[in-house]
Amino acid sequence: MNIISPSILAADFGNLNKEIERISEAQWVHIDVMDGHFVPNISFGLPIVSAVRKLTAQVLDVHLMISNPLTYAERFVKAGADFVVFHMESDDDPKEVIRAVRNAGAKVGAAIKPGTPVEVLYDVMDSLDLALIMTVEPGFGGQSFLYDTEPKIRALRTFCNENGLNVPIQVDG
């Protein structure tokens, strides 16, 4: 099954209600959180997640492109995230981030940048509800798809199939 999770990165936040209404047919809403450290851009944080949660019952897929996801994971769940997706390249121990998100009551995903080997996900795949492969460099919207990321998607699907894992793979970019 394919799920489309429209990003609100380019939304008009002066008309957030209308923007969420425009994507109301989608099952999920993708919220990119950027801190200006892990990626060079800054987007938005807890107040936007909370505002979107008040506007919709859609699944909120919160993608943390931040240096220290462990510090914020529980707060994003309390703000309304259904999924918290962190980057394997962040400063925190992935297993601790996974545990923190689960303990806070949300589902958890792990992401990798285009230049990161897909194999870094293998050790945690059995603990994830979702794996995200970036097909653009994180931090900016409107980039072109990096076709050399396609083999990673296939390799991760093969790994899941060979290990009896039913973990959805999200492609972002």
PLM segments and residue spans:
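Short, glycine/charged-rich beta-strand-loop motifs at protein surfaces that mediate ligand recognition
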Residues: G141-L146, Q170
